[in-house]
């Protein structure tokens, strides 16, 4: 279609709408997104625990284990095994031939503070024999494990903020204003690892990253920010195990 034809069609649609000959209405549509992993061989799932770290304000590993169990009970067809989460950080520390330096053993500080620290522990996620033993204890379920970093972040820069004002005609208008601001918040970086409990072999893994930033003067609890960020990530996690439906709207002309 030529540019002139497009303009003509648009003008006709606008004219018909003005004349009251056309009705526009929205309809809700659902788009299925196929599961990333075939879980048909498994009837049960074990959320085994996570390597957690970042800030001392929140136990990211424990919160993630609890949240995923709750989500899987209501949104998956598998039975969730009720078991305590494995303490994976302590498991790796027990295997060390060289003890940790005294400065690294403070009780209120997490062993894993950043990505560099995490690399010292990640080998347990690919330890086939370890996960095979875990699987044998629970009769070969699908095992979910991984790592989760929940860290404090600060950002400085130019941001856009909406400003509401009243124009000369008395109408309320909104405009975007750009201004420099200091912000603080949290970042969430989980890696979900799916393991065949019958063999200990890793079947699939996927990483995510989200940030939530707030005004420097705003005091947002760590737990509130954690749940805000996990809400964004959960659809991607659940889509690994089952087909998810994404809801949207379409505008139809009648």
Where are the model-predicted features located?
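Sec-dependent bacterial lipoprotein signal peptides
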Residues: 1-21
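Residues at the start of alpha-helices and the adjacent loop-to-helix junctions
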Residues: 2-7, 127, 138, 225
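A generic structural signal for short, solvent-exposed coil/turn residues
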Residues: 10-13, 39, 72, 180
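N-terminal segment of the mature soluble domain
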Residues: 44, 48-152, 197, 201, ...
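Generic alpha-helix detector with strongest preference for long hydrophobic helices that associate
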Residues: 2, 28, 49, 53, ...
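C-terminal/domain-edge helix-coil "capping" segments
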Residues: 21-43, 137-138, 150-254
